[in-house]
């Protein structure tokens, strides 16, 4: 589970954009990526997630966390600190995947017939038994295809024009060949709503845990509470 933090004011936005494409190409359905926008001039921040970003003291954008365990990894580059621009984020992701998972979470979401509500159900199956009171679920809704002609994206990749970087990584080319301020971009995986992002939802996980026993939790999102949503048909639910 990757939380991708960005902003229309983040001049390194291209690194997060390209990183997401490459991760999806490599891992397919085995990776979940949600993108949290942040900043007073960004048109896409979700209120609760902005509060969460403040809570954790995020220092720069773009940025990522993996499973809320591997913190502040720069997208595309990851923890690599060498002098060359190398796609090494996969090394960090593979390291995170090697850690034994304590549970699996299956999530389903359904948009109501009147398009006003999304009902979400999470089924959690733990890999151990015991008494633990430190687990809780949080939920996010993301939207794909968000765009507006008035949105302006800061971009510093234009400074690499003439260095041949696009030959090494073709996905950077649209940004290298663009100007310092870009318009017409389409934003996917954007967090438009969340519940419990900061501390989890109290009571969503029973402290009495039995191996292979499925715990079920349900919540609803009233979409009128989230005005940044553009197209209710392009929403995805995660927990």
Spell out what each predicted region is:
Residues 32-239:
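Short, conserved sequence motifs used for protein processing/export or organelle targeting and
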């Amino acid at each position: 589970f990757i939380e991708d933090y960005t902003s229309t004011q983040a001049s390194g936005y291209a690194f997060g954009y390209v990183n997401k494409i490459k991760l999806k190409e490599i891992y397919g359905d085995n990776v979940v990526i949600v993108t949290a926008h942040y900043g007073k001039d960004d048109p896409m921040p979700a209120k609760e997630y902005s509060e969460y970003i403040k809570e954790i003291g995020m220092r720069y954008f773009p940025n990522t966390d993996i499973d809320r365990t591997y913190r502040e990894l720069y997208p595309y580059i990851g923890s690599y600190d060498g002098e060359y621009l190398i796609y090494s984020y996969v090394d960090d992701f593979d390291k995170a995947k090697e850690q034994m998972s304590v549970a699996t979470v299956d999530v389903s979401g359904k948009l109501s017939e009147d398009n006003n509500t999304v009902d979400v159900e999470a089924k959690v199956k733990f890999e151990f038994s015991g008494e633990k009171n430190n687990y809780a679920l949080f939920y996010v809704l993301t939207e794909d295809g968000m765009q507006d002609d008035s949105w302006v994206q800061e971009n510093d990749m234009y400074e690499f024009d003439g260095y041949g970087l696009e030959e090494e990584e073709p996905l950077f080319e649209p940004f290298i060949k663009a100007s310092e301020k870009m318009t017409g971009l389409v934003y996917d995986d954007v967090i438009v709503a969340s519940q419990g992002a900061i501390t989890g939802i109290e009571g969503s996980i029973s402290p009495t845990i039995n191996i292979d026993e499925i715990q079920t939790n349900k919540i609803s999102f009233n979409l009128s509470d989230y005005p940044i949503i553009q197209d209710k048909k392009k929403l995805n639910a995660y927990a």
